Amino acid sequence: GLPTCGETCFGGTCNTPGCTCDSSWPICTHN
């Protein structure tokens, strides 16, 4: 399955592959 995106981020990058950080939402989500 896909990795879970749940890291807290603040306009930065996510350590989990396939995840992105939206500047308006401080949690990594699937891109």
Swiss-Prot record:
Q: In which tissues is it expressed?
A: Expressed in leaves but not in petals, petioles, roots and runners (at protein level).
**Entry keywords, A to Z:** Disulfide bond, Knottin, Plant defense
Q: Name one GO biological process term.
A: defense response
How this protein is processed and modified after translation, per its record? This is a cyclic peptide.
SUPFAM superfamilies xrefs: Cyclotides
Give the position of the cross-link Cyclopeptide (Gly-Asn). G1-N31
Q: In terms of domain of life, where is this protein from?
A: Eukaryota
> Which one Pfam family would you cite for this protein?
Cyclotide
Disulfide linkages recorded for this protein, renumbered to the chain, are C5-C19, C9-C21, C14-C28
- Does the record carry Calcium as a key word? no
Give the domain section of the comments: The presence of a 'disulfide through disulfide knot' structurally defines this protein as a knottin.
Job of this protein? Probably participates in a plant defense mechanism.
| Membership in a protein family | Belongs to the cyclotide family. Moebius subfamily.
Q: What is this protein called?
A: Cycloviolacin-O23
The species is Viola odorata
